Amino acid sequence: MNHHNSLDSSDITYKTEELLEATTNRYKITVQVANRAKRRKYEDVDIIDDPQIKPVIRAILEMVDEITQPEIISD
């Protein structure tokens, strides 16, 4: 996930819009993002992965990648 290190706010906004457009239920995807971010925050408490990227941003980026690049999770 090193390609996420140089994201600016416009990239994050674009990815968020991409995620919202890919789903039919905005509420459900928002809850999923929040739950993933919360889970990741507590699971990775010992791991200092990248303090620049907040858990919610990381969750959005991961979910967009999973939706737009299904080959990532099929391997």
Swiss-Prot record:
GO MF, one annotated term: DNA-directed RNA polymerase activity
The keyword Transferase belongs to this UniProt entry's keyword annotation: yes
GO cellular component entries: chloroplast; DNA-directed RNA polymerase complex; mitochondrion
Predominant localisation class: plastid
Enzyme Commission no: 2.7.7.6
UniProtKB keywords: Chloroplast, DNA-directed RNA polymerase, Nucleotidyltransferase, Plastid, Transcription, Transferase
Record field: catalytic activity: RNA(n) + a ribonucleoside 5'-triphosphate = RNA(n+1) + diphosphate
Localization terms from the record: Plastid, Chloroplast
InterPro entries in UniProt: DNA-dir_RNA_pol_omega, Pol_omega/Rpo6/RPB6, RPB6/omega-like_sf
Pfam families the UniProt entry points to: RNA_pol_Rpb6
One of the protein's GO biological processes: DNA-templated transcription
Keyword GTP-binding annotated: no
Top-level taxon in the UniProt lineage: Eukaryota
HAMAP family hit by this protein: RNApol_bact_RpoZ
Function of the protein: May be involved in RNA polymerase activity.
Family to which this protein belongs: Belongs to the RNA polymerase subunit omega family.
Name by which UniProt lists this protein: Putative DNA-directed RNA polymerase subunit omega
Source organism of this protein record: Porphyra purpurea
Lineage of producing organism: Eukaryota, Rhodophyta, Bangiophyceae, Bangiales, Bangiaceae
